[in-house]
Amino acid sequence: MKNLIAELLFKLAQKEEESKELCAQVEALEIIVTAMLRNMAQNDQQRLIDQVEGALYEVKPDASIPDDDTELLRDYVKKLLRHPRQ
């Protein structure tokens, strides 16, 4: 029983570490996208936003991915492009 608990705690710690790594990657990408957008001319910024939103619109939904997840992704991309970090 102790071994099982120890193994579960170890797996939980691994998952937490993976989660932290993913969060750091997302934060880094947000910073990069924000910096790029801020350094672009307004018309170039708008062209990029239109291209990204167009690409997202053209992607066919995957039946294995819940609609809520797809909508969450689209909302987050829109927020990142239209209202970058301060």
Swiss-Prot record:
Residues 1-36 form a coiled coil. It comes from Escherichia coli O1:K1 / APEC. Belongs to the IraP family. Keywords: Coiled coil, Cytoplasm, Stress response. Its main location: cytoplasm. The keyword Cytoplasm applies. Transmembrane segments: none annotated. It is found in: Cytoplasm. Inhibits RpoS proteolysis by regulating RssB activity, thereby increasing the stability of the sigma stress factor RpoS especially during phosphate starvation, but also in stationary phase and during nitrogen starvation. Its effect on RpoS stability is due to its interaction with RssB, which probably blocks the interaction of RssB with RpoS, and the consequent delivery of the RssB-RpoS complex to the ClpXP protein degradation pathway. NCBIfam families: PRK10244.1. Disulfide bonds: none annotated. One of its GO terms (cellular component) is cytoplasm. Interacts with RssB. GO terms for biological process: cellular response to starvation. This is Anti-adapter protein IraP.
